[in-house]
A protein has these predicted regions:
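Short, well-ordered alpha-helical packing segments
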Residues: 7, 31-32, 170
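Flexible, solvent-exposed loop/hinge segments and secondary-structure transition points
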Residues: 21, 26-28, 32-128, 135, ...
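Cytosolic-side transmembrane helix boundary signature
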Residues: 1-7
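Basic, gly/Ser/Thr/Pro-rich low-complexity segments located predominantly at protein N termini
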Residues: 14, 58, 162-165
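Hydrophobic membrane-insertion alpha-helices, especially the h-region
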Residues: 9-27
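Extracytoplasmic/periplasmic C-terminal soluble domains
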Residues: 134-135, 139-177
Length: 177
């Protein structure tokens, strides 16, 4: 009787191992690759993932939202709306943008809740056009048109606000001369 129960247990374990350890992961991976190839592979661009915000150095690049200071940490600073430290941080960021000739917008001054938001508002992108165009020695209207071409509408036409993916915009910017 002991050997019969042991045998049944091993057979059930082997069946579930094959189903849940091999068949299910292979099926979901195959379906993901077939139907959502780019998303299943991390939505990668030439220089990173379009789903993760990056810091770009230099006036020749469009800047995304600021991170909380530690790029490996995903999360906000946890400073409240009455925090003097938060207000001082916003003032410093706004002053730094103004020194570069960029009119500060809320999403260029305030970090996102996750700290890795890859998108900015169209207003934030347009605010940087003059600076980027001057740094790249390209006419403003060409950079403006590039931004306009990279404005994505709300998801499914009604969820969220229009946005610009900074990685996609900067990758397109490399081809603009």
């Amino acid at each position: 009787m002991l050997w019969v129960n042991l045998r049944r247990g091993l057979i059930v374990s082997a069946i579930f191992f094959v189903l849940l350890g091999l068949a299910y992961p292979l099926a979901t991976t195959g379906i993901g690759q077939a139907l959502f190839h780019d998303q299943a592979n991390g939505s990668l661009g030439k220089n990173g993932s379009t789903l993760v915000g990056q810091q770009w150095k230099g006036a020749q690049w469009f800047q995304g939202r600021p991170d909380g200071g530690d790029p490996t940490a995903t999360g906000g600073s946890n400073l409240g709306p009455r925090s003097k430290e938060l207000l001082d941080t916003y003032k410093k960021r706004a002053a730094a943008l103004e020194r570069q000739g960029i009119k500060p917008t809320p999403d260029l001054v305030a970090a996102s809740g996750s700290g890795i938001d890859p998108d900015i508002s169209p207003a934030a992108a347009y605010a940087q056009v003059d600076t980027v165009a001057a740094a790249r020695h390209v006419p403003d209207d060409r950079v403006h048109a590039l931004v306009a071409a990279h404005v994505h509408g709300p998801q499914w036409g009604f969820l969220g606000a229009p946005h610009v993916n900074v990685l996609e915009l900067n990758e397109a910017l490399t081809g603009l001369q």
